Amino acid sequence: MAVMEFANVSFRYPTSKEQVLKEVSFQVQKGEFIVLCGASGSGKTTLLKHMIKSQIPIGIGSGSMYFAGADIETMDDRVAASQIAYVGQDPEHNMVTDYVWQELAFGLESLGMSVPQMRRRTAEMAEYFGLESLFRKRTAALSGGQKQLVQLAAAMVVQPKLLVLDEPTSQLDPMEAGRFLDTLAKLHEEFGVTIFLSEQRLDGVLPIADRVFVMEDGTVTDTTPRRVGHLLKERHDPVYAALPIAAKTALCCGESGDLPLTVREGKVWLRDYLKAHSEVSLETIVERITKMAPEISVSEYFGNADIEKPDIQR
């Protein structure tokens, strides 16, 4: 049985004639890591809100959403809150208490958990997320990255079956975003929680994702991390710019198969490509990349990949 299922879901807001979701259907299996991407205004946030009973927007809709076979709209509120956790874009807006320990305990208290159980759960989560030193600090004194980490810990403390995240790194700097995504990958690996993540920093999540859902004009296309680059390129989707450098390099060179996602994989791919295409020089590839994907820092990429011209062009 699927953890999450959408069956022909369509939706529009009361003040609009345009459908935000158009006959959306998909299934998410237990333990999967799903990445949702798409241009601004494609319907991502509205889609995610339909997964959270308390956040389903008011409007005109059709179709059904199911969690573990149960209709989300008619689920018991307590069950929905304990089984499906949500982390939003703005940690400032999502904070509901003054202190970190209160933030961690808030969801458990809402579910009626006993004080001893709450203490044990919050202590375990604080230790797991490395929040011991922040445990009694005011939430207002935390950095953006720390606040978002607290939000993630608060979501996980109820031990949900599904974790839904709406662009959680959008307000974080690159280093904080990297640490957050690393923590998310660790959670998925160690807890086996099903993750549905809307994210634009694709370079940090494609290597750990099982599938990628691409939204465009209210529709969803299901693809894989190693094939999504082809789809984005074909559609001239602005999200193409967020692909890992290794994937864009391969696309610029005409790769039609699975794409490399990490610098290490990119190094291997480029070495093999140059061996198979002796007529192509590294300078030609650099020129091609610069023309087709000017956002790539070519010198930084090849430096990180530790590729030296004499070695790969022999």
Please place each PLM-identified region on the residue numbering:
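A short, flexible loop at the N-terminus of ABC-type nucleotide-binding domains that lies
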Residues: 1-6, 11-23, 55-57, 76, ...
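Catalytic Walker B motif of ABC-type/P-loop ATPase nucleotide-binding domains
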Residues: 163-166
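ABC ATPase C-loop
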Residues: 155-156
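Conserved ABC ATPase signature
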Residues: 138-142, 146
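ABC ATPase NBD coupling module
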Residues: 71-85
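Conserved ABC transporter NBD signature motif
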Residues: 60-71, 313
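Conserved ABC ATPase "signature" region
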Residues: 116-134, 296, 300
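Conserved beta-strand-loop-alpha-helix hinge in the C-terminal portion
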Residues: 215, 219-260
